[in-house]
């Protein structure tokens, strides 16, 4: 089968087309998964509005939209830990992007960890969920970085 | 600094605790990023409600909640392409999980591709966004798998 989009697909077909037509949700957001370009590990999950997506494409730095602060946000603007985007991908229904980044300072999480995913979900002897710290070393002290 | 949670943190502290306290959104969902345990590539982004999360933890197979169909969904129940979960992780604010899976049949996307992220976002000569197919080979024919 063809490795490219079928010739029968319209250029702006959501799944098979080659035109960017992001499907923003009711809040104007798409999901962004950010991975470390070297290790492949998931660093964080965040959201982009149309402006954040455009700025990321144009600048090559990761921009997000903070739901809690309700504002556009250039990753690293407070901490200096900028994310340089090496590759951007779009999913089948165009409501999620995956960016592979070079993480400035090595730490993406506001808690100082490399990744936001520093706890594994395990089960205890009774089968109940239990969290286990993994890769939970802090690479910076949040109190010193975010003043 | 310590690799485990600070002793000063309460066990049920959202960021530093070791108790699972998922923060579901207004629709009762958390985001799930699913990666291939071998390649590390992002296969898909989907959502879990409380029941999907519990069933995933208990069964070791990936369960999701389909927003479009508004129903609980065991990945592979139509296609047979089940996802075996090798590791689950939780993010800092407990509103996203990352699961590393062994993808049955090798393809996670309903279009037949290995990953839902089969298009790269590039820019054309004028700087406008342009999608380029990458890893876009179909491993199965959706018309034959979903009848």
Swiss-Prot record, chains A, B:
Chief location category: cytoplasm
Cofactor: Mg(2+); Zn(2+)
Name of the top EC class for this enzyme: hydrolase
Binding site residues for Mg(2+): 91, 93, 95
Signal peptide: none
Subcellular location: Cytoplasm
Chaperone in keyword set: no
Domain of life the protein comes from: Bacteria
Positions bound to Zn(2+): 92, 109, 116
Record's catalysed reaction(s): 1-(5-phospho-beta-D-ribosyl)-5'-AMP + H2O = 1-(5-phospho-beta-D-ribosyl)-5-[(5-phospho-beta-D-ribosylamino)methylideneamino]imidazole-4-carboxamide
A GO MF label: magnesium ion binding
UniProt entry keywords in alphabetical sequence: Amino-acid biosynthesis, Cytoplasm, Histidine biosynthesis, Hydrolase, Magnesium, Metal-binding, Zinc
Cofactor binding summary note: Binds 1 Mg(2+) ion per subunit. Binds 1 zinc ion per subunit.
Pathway listed: Amino-acid biosynthesis; L-histidine biosynthesis; L-histidine from 5-phospho-alpha-D-ribose 1-diphosphate: step 3/9
GO CC term, one of those recorded: cytoplasm
Annotated InterPro entries: PRA-CH, PRib_AMP_CycHydrolase_dom, PRib_AMP_CycHydrolase_sf
One GO-annotated biological process of the protein: L-histidine biosynthetic process
Cross-referenced PANTHER family: HISTIDINE BIOSYNTHESIS BIFUNCTIONAL PROTEIN, HISTIDINE BIOSYNTHESIS BIFUNCTIONAL PROTEIN HIS7
Subunit structure: Homodimer.
Function recorded in the entry: Catalyzes the hydrolysis of the adenine ring of phosphoribosyl-AMP.
UniProt family annotation: Belongs to the PRA-CH family.
Protein name: Phosphoribosyl-AMP cyclohydrolase
Gene behind the chain: hisI
């Amino acid at each position: 089968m063809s490795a490219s989009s079928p010739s029968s697909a319209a250029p702006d077909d959501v799944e098979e087309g080659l035109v960017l037509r992001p499907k923003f949700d009711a809040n104007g957001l798409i999901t962004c998964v950010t991975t470390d370009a070297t290790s492949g590990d998931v660093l964080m999950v965040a959201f982009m509005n149309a402006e954040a997506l455009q700025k990321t494409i144009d600048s090559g730095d990761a921009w997000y939209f903070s739901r809690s602060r309700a504002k556009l946000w250039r990753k690293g603007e407070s901490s200096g830990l900028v994310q340089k985007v090496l590759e951007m991908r779009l999913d089948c229904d165009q409501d999620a992007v995956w960016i592979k980044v070079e993480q400035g300072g090595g730490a993406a999480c506001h808690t100082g960890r490399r990744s936001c995913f520093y706890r594994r979900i395990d089960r205890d002897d009774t089968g109940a969920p239990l969290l286990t710290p993994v890769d939970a070393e802090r690479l910076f002290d949040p109190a010193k970085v975010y003043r």
